[in-house]
Amino acid sequence: MRVDGRAHDQLRPVTITRNYIKHAEGSCLIEVGDTKVICTATLEERVPPFMRGGGKGWITAEYSMLPRATATRNARESSKGKVGGRTMEIQRLIGRALRSVVNLEAMGERTIWLDCDVIQADGGTRTASITGAFVAMVDAMQKLVDSGTWKQLPLNDFLAATSVGVVGEEAVLDLNYKEDSTAIVDMNVVMTGKGKFVELQGTGEDAPFSPEQLQEMISLAKVGIDNLIHSQKEALADVTLSFAQSVAEESHA
């Protein structure tokens, strides 16, 4: 039995609240159990200098935590004068993940900034950020479709992420903080709606793990991501038809 009573293949309750920040082109609050992240998407009519003149768009991300998102206060990174290594790694992961399902050429020379701010952390903050940032990004993109700037969403699939690991002797899905802190193996998995992998980040924290354990964790991750994408589709119900048409056209392009 897990510490919170869940089955080994069970996600924590997931809630996605769209349009959470009124000023942003796209936003949501994603809650995965007690982990809560505000995700915003901002449209910018330019690209970074290294992209200029290429005719392509760009997706980039920033990630941060409130000082009391955790059990003890963590100083803001701005007060330290630099972004920490963990934060930089997570920001790059979020950006890479979201770019994998976007047709950058179809964006034109525009940037979408994804800001993921953790307001309460109980494990899985980076994976919740990816799952929520996707929803915020879709809403921001839909605004350009609604305005006539784009004919369709420049997307080729849904995208979500979850954590898996080995706690005790059992492979489990969606680790909370207590489980993560005692896990023998910890892994983050990012996948598309078609079941393709975008990223696998796995570490034997306490001991090496077997190919059989790896396969079991991947199978659990697929179950979790299927459910997370179902939650995304429910949250995005009013843009699902437009999105489905975009995905179909991208798939046959």
UniProtKB/Swiss-Prot annotation:
It comes from the Bacteria. One of its GO terms (biological process) is rRNA catabolic process. Keywords: Nucleotidyltransferase, RNA-binding, rRNA processing, Transferase, tRNA processing, tRNA-binding. Phosphate binds at residues 86, 124-126. Homohexameric ring arranged as a trimer of dimers. Phosphorolytic 3'-5' exoribonuclease that plays an important role in tRNA 3'-end maturation. Removes nucleotide residues following the 3'-CCA terminus of tRNAs; can also add nucleotides to the ends of RNA molecules by using nucleoside diphosphates as substrates, but this may not be physiologically important. Probably plays a role in initiation of 16S rRNA degradation (leading to ribosome degradation) during starvation. This is Ribonuclease PH. It comes from Brevibacillus brevis (strain 47 / JCM 6285 / NBRC 100599).
